[in-house]
Amino acid sequence: MRQHVNPLSRFFQLPRPLPSPEEMFAQSSRPLHLDIGCARGGFLLGLAPLQPEWNHVGVEIRHPLVLSAERDRQELKLDNLRFLFCNVNVSLEEWLDALPRDQLQWVSIQFPDPWFKRRHQKRRVLQPSLLIALATALQPGRELFIQSDVLSVIEPMVMLIEQSNCFKRPGDDFHPWQRTNPMPVPTERERYVLDQGLQVYRRLYQRNDQQAPELSNLEALWQQVDNPSEEEHSDC
């Protein structure tokens, strides 16, 4: 069972300086993949050896998981992978702003913590300010991939992304949910869900050429995002 932390607690509201690609990687000019909410890092530990031409960064708010993932990375001697501890909605925007143009080419948000209730909206990982920061860092054609096994978790993410008008779905994707994972390695949660015969809801987006919206405008739209079945879920 996943252990939640409250990202709005005082401890997690303290900004953390994050190392630049030059500080993390010997070959820092490689294209960058950012995995938001990487948990114990099993997905990236499997992916990084298959994509040595990429640098991979996993960010996670649960510090013990980051320490565990970093130990595994060091044992495997993966020099194109790093794990960072932070609250992405506090510390990531400045890091994204400092990246060289078009270095960030792929972003994944997979099976985020299920803050169901609307009053917990600000605890959800994909906030308007983070989406704008990602949209600003991603050049046209670069990709954002999201997936979850909980429909009421991924639907608000989809609504926020599409309300931003910064992303489009690939032209050959006509299904409500993408049927296959575009990545060659599943997450631990994905394997578990599929082994149970349950559905995974996926969306792949490409950055379009529209300018990122003003934060206040997107926040106003975000307040309209609601989960009508929220009362069916207990507090987390």
Curated annotation (Swiss-Prot):
Keyword S-adenosyl-L-methionine set for record: yes
EC number(s) reported in the record: 2.1.1.33
The protein's annotated pathway: tRNA modification; N(7)-methylguanine-tRNA biosynthesis
Catalytic activities: guanosine(46) in tRNA + S-adenosyl-L-methionine = N(7)-methylguanosine(46) in tRNA + S-adenosyl-L-homocysteine
Sequence positions that bind S-adenosyl-L-methionine: D35, E60, N87, D113
Gene Ontology MF, one: tRNA (guanine(46)-N7)-methyltransferase activity
One Gene Ontology cellular component: tRNA methyltransferase complex
Keyword terms, alphabetized: Methyltransferase, S-adenosyl-L-methionine, Transferase, tRNA processing
Residues the record marks as active site: D113
Transmembrane segment boundaries: none
Binding site for substrate: K117, D149
Uppermost EC category: transferase
Keyword ATP-binding: no
NCBIfam families membership: tRNA (guanosine(46)-N7)-methyltransferase TrmB
Protein family: Belongs to the class I-like SAM-binding methyltransferase superfamily. TrmB family.
Free-text function comment from the UniProt entry: Catalyzes the formation of N(7)-methylguanine at position 46 (m7G46) in tRNA.
Protein name: tRNA (guanine-N(7)-)-methyltransferase
Lineage, uppermost ranks: Bacteria, Bacillati, Cyanobacteriota, Cyanophyceae, Synechococcales
